[in-house]
């Protein structure tokens, strides 16, 4: 897949955490295999870029972006935005990829039944590890699950089943009225 990206030069790179984790694994293994001085320089650059990301959300760095262009070129060198969703992803992986590819990564929450439109992080939000607020096309609420002792009134962190409603929510399962009735309350 990475070889295809280098040839196709996409501007937008949506993916799932599983693929991002594989990319992370290959990149970190590649860095670890570099000779000492090269590995030191890459790690110094990563540290500087991580500091800038944590300080003010910048994913670029004037001194180190030339070095990291080799990583960008793995995806064709033209990617301006990456997105992820469908499963949780480790903050460490997201921050590493933001710094290596010098692009923001938007993390989202949604379901097939919501056309993925649950919530997304803001492109300018430097904080990783959350999926942002609700999108404009959806309402989100927590439904109490007393049998599991999950209550929306739990402090400090409310818990419950996440329920979505809005125009982006599907109308039902094709020829599966039983499953449709089960999905809506």
Predicted regions and their residues:
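A short local structural element in Rossmann-fold oxidoreductases
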Residues: 6, 24-25, 94, 174
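Conserved P-loop NTPase motor core
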Residues: 1-3, 106
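A short beta-to-alpha transition loop/helix N-cap that caps and shapes the active-site region
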Residues: 2, 22-23, 116-117
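Alpha-helical "lid/cap" subdomains adjacent to substrate-binding clefts that gate access
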Residues: 8-81
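Conserved AMP-binding/adenylate-forming
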Residues: 13, 66-185
């Amino acid at each position: 897949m990475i070889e295809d990206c280098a040839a196709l030069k996409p501007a937008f790179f949506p993916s799932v955490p599983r693929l991002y984790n594989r990319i992370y694994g290959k990149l970190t293994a590649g860095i670890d295999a570099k000779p000492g001085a090269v590995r030191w320089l890459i790690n110094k650059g990563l540290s500087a870029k991580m500091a800038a990301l944590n300080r003010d959300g910048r994913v670029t760095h004037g001194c180190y972006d030339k070095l990291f262009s080799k990583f960008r070129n793995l995806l064709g060198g033209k990617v301006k935005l990456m997105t992820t969703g469908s499963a949780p992803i480790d903050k460490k992986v997201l921050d590493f990829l933001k710094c290596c590819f010098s692009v923001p990564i938007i993390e989202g929450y949604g379901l097939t039944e919501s056309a993925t439109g649950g919530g997304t992080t803001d492109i300018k939000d430097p904080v990783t590890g959350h999926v942002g607020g609700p999108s404009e096309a959806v309402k989100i609420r927590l439904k109490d699950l007393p049998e599991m002792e999950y209550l929306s009134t739990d402090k400090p962190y409310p818990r419950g089943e996440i329920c979505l409603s809005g125009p982006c929510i599907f109308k039902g399962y094709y020829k599966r009225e039983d499953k449709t009735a089960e999905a809506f309350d």
